């Protein structure tokens, strides 16, 4: 620690008490990185841990935990029940020493402490230790433990498990390990290295492990939608508009990252053709030290003709050594058709564990019925990868300096004919009245930089590329010739707007300021956080010409009342979770219902089409306009929603429609019908029963230009 080094290096004797205080303060403080949505700048928040004797701690900041999956996980009753049963089956010795790694709210630790007490462990030397490195969650766990009278029965460590030491922290090696460091892919949260380190440093010989084993499965599928999510080259060839993001022999210069992509595949059930039966990929035995790397060669017999566009995968947990307690993330069709008990397990919709999709490259791999295909599966410490028919695309997936990897939805958008046409026509109209323009691409849009450069050979294009930076510049150099422009036309600044000066623009006025808007790394954020474009436009105000063309020229905040029972249940407030009171976490985790007053949970980003059962209960309403011809300013809007369908209204979906050209009525919508965009979802404090002609809802919203946040309020009335 630098502060300690300064004290020790001054040559003065350092009082041991002063050093202890300093070390304690540093150990009880954490820094949380937060992205400012309007600037793209990273900001640090300081999270303090209260002293042990403080029995009325301040709750951890709500915004840090409300956007996590903890609440959804705690509402997963099948998961909670399976862990409780497995822990009770494992804790049979009253002298058991239990270690919970990645303890979260402490639920598994409390289950272990209760099971230990049931076998007399409190008087026989049994113990439970909980390791949670994320300080905001650790603070919340202490509140949960106090609420359940468990603060003296579970020892909490705010450390990573590889920082724990036997004798310094743990009295002796643990003989039972419980953990849930699992993601949708299974390995992505560091399960293997965590278990390896625990076996090496923290566990006794032959420990009991919960969960005991995991098995991953896969299935070959054909799906036009999944094909569009990864094959930009062939989809833009179908668009035939002359703009080539992936020209000629460079079809992989823009691609989806070669990894498993989490997705709610049940929502695609009606548009997927299954080309094989489910097949087993890897079995991970957690009851012994796991290997870092393995490879499996699998023969798969196809069940029909088609093109393999993707492999959909999932996993099944066996939580106990007896093989009687299971949890599965299998898609609905696999659970319904499987003859295996673990796969048949039926559970509620949840969002914290999804299925995963691995994309084939290009148009897919052709297959005929009853053909045997060879699949090579590999795993390292954090991921699983696939190679179908060996010698296929896997060897070419290394990322070169000019290659760009994007999220699947962005790939699909760039290949969408209607989206491309809207931008092309708008830019073409703008260039007819602008000769030799100076154009600033205010975001990370490769498409707009290529489009303007190829359409206007005399233009000067300045690409800000705050996220792409040097990789964006290398990419443009590679595709310039194929798009018939000189790379000398384009200058990549690689800066945020706050750092740009007139010198960067060669003291020329900007005639065109354009964006999609798209900021690399912000794709999963709330829709209005792309109003960063408005903030950029404001910072560049003095550099714009009087008649500058701005695209988009306006944003319109839209909303639609929705029935979202599955999402509501996963975000609903907690009371009893397997016998433990969790009501103290509701406000911090952003739960719905049973909060003080009419307090609502936060508005969160979701692909609404993936949110289980959904139903629109009203038409689409406009709530607020953002006029980009003006500098950024506060905005307020309100509307009255009249319902067109009866049902239970759980909240509303909200998004921004981008007006590219107001005169030509060219608008790009990002609403729920467009599956390439996330919407904001504001759930109500309580669901409302609505009827057409009888129910009315008033919604108000305000935009704060200093934070980029939009706050909502709503009230409903029923006419007799």
Curated annotation (Swiss-Prot):
Signal sequence, renumbered to the chain: none
GO term, biological process aspect, one: methylation
InterPro entries, alphabetized: Arg_MeTrfase, MeTrfase_PRMT7, PRMT_dom, SAM-dependent_MTases_sf
Annotated ranges, domain SAM-dependent MTase PRMT-type: 54-385, 387-720
Keywords: Methyltransferase, Repeat, S-adenosyl-L-methionine, Transferase
Gene Ontology terms for molecular function: histone methyltransferase activity; protein-arginine N-methyltransferase activity
Stored Pfam families: PRMT_C
Domain of life from the UniProt record: Eukaryota
Active site residues according to the UniProt entry: 180, 189
Known function: Arginine methyltransferase that can both catalyze the formation of omega-N monomethylarginine (MMA) and symmetrical dimethylarginine (sDMA).
Similarity field: Belongs to the class I-like SAM-binding methyltransferase superfamily. Protein arginine N-methyltransferase family. PRMT7 subfamily.
The name this protein goes by in its record: Protein arginine N-methyltransferase 7
Gene giving rise to this polypeptide: PRMT7
């Amino acid at each position: 620690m630098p502060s300690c080094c300064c004290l020790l290096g001054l040559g003065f004797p350092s009082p041991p008490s002063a050093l202890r205080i300093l070390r304690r303060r540093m150990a009880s403080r954490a820094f949380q990185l937060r992205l400012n949505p309007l600037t793209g700048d990273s900001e640090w928040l300081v999270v303090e841990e209260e002293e042990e004797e403080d029995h009325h701690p301040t709750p951890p900041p709500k915004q840090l935990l409300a956007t996590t999956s903890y609440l959804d996980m705690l509402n997963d009753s099948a998961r909670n029940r399976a862990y409780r049963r497995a822990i009770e089956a494992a804790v049979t010795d009253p002298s058991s020493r239990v270690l919970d790694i990645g303890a979260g709210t402490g639920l598994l630790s409390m289950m272990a402490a209760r099971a230990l007490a049931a076998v007399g462990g409190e008087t026989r030397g049994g113990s439970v230790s909980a390791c949670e490195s994320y300080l905001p969650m650790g603070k919340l766990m202490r509140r949960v433990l106090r609420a359940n009278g468990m603060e003296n029965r579970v020892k909490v460590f705010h450390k990573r498990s590889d920082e724990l030491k036997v004798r310094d922290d743990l009295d002796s090696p643990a003989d039972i390990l419980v953990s849930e460091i699992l993601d949708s892919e299974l390995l992505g949260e560091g399960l293997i290295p965590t278990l390896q380190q625990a076996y090496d440093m923290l566990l006794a010989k032959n420990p009991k492990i919960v969960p005991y084993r995991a098995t991953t499965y896969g299935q070959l599928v054909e799906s036009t939608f999944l094909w569009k999510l990864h094959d930009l080259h062939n989809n833009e060839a179908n668009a035939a508009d002359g703009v080539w993001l992936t020209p000629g022999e460079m079809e992989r210069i823009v691609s989806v990252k070669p990894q498993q992509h989490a997705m709610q595949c049940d929502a695609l059930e009606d548009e997927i053709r299954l080309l094989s039966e489910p097949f087993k990929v890897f079995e991970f035995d957690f009851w012994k030290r796991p290997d870092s790397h393995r490879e499996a060669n699998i023969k798969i017999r196809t069940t029909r003709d088609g093109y393999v566009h993707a492999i959909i995968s999932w996993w099944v947990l066996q939580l106990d050594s007896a093989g009687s307690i299971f949890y599965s993330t299998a898609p609905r069709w696999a659970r319904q058709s499987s003859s295996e008990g673990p796969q048949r397990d039926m559970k509620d919709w949840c969002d914290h564990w999804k299925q995963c999709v691995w994309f084939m490259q290009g148009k897919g791999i052709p297959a005929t019925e009853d053909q045997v295909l060879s699949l090579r599966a590999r795993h390292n410490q954090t991921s699983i990868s696939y190679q179908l028919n060996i010698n296929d695309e896997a060897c070419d997936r290394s990322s070169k300096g000019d290659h760009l990897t994007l999220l699947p939805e962005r790939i699909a958008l760039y290949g969408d004919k209607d989206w491309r046409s809207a931008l092309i026509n708008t830019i073409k109209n703008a260039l007819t009245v602008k000769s030799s323009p100076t154009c600033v691409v205010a975001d990370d849009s490769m498409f707009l930089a290529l489009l303007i450069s190829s359409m206007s050979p005399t233009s000067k294009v300045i690409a800000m590329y705050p996220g792409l930076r040097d990789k964006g510049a290398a990419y443009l150099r590679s595709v310039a010739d194929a798009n018939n422009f000189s790379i000398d036309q384009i200058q990549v600044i690689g800066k945020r707007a706050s750092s740009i000066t007139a010198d960067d623009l060669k003291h020329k006025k900007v005639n065109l300021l354009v964006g999609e808007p798209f900021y690399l790394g912000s794709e999963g954020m709330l829709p209005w956080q792309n109003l960063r474009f408005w903030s950029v436009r404001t910072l560049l105000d003095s550099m714009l010409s009087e008649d500058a063309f701005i695209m988009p020229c306006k944003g319109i905040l839209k909303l639609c009342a929705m029935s979202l029972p599955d999402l509501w249940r996963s975000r609903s407030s907690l009371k009893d979770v397997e016998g433990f009171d969790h009501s103290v976490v509701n406000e911090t985790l952003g739960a719905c219902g049973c909060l003080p007053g009419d307090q609502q949970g936060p508005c969160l980003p979701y692909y609404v089409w993936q949110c289980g059962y959904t139903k629109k209960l009203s038409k689409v309403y406009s709530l607020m306009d953002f006029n980009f011809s003006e500098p950024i300013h506060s905005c307020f809007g309100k509307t009255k929603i009249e319902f067109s369908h009866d049902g239970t209204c759980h909240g509303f979906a909200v998004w921004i429609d981008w007006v590219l050209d107001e005169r030509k009525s060219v608008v790009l919508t990002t609403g729920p019908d467009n599956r390439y965009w996330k919407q904001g979802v504001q759930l109500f404090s309580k669901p409302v029963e609505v009827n057409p002609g009888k129910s009315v809802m008033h919604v108000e919203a305000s935009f704060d230009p200093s934070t980029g946040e939009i706050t909502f309020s709503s009230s409903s009335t029923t006419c007799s």
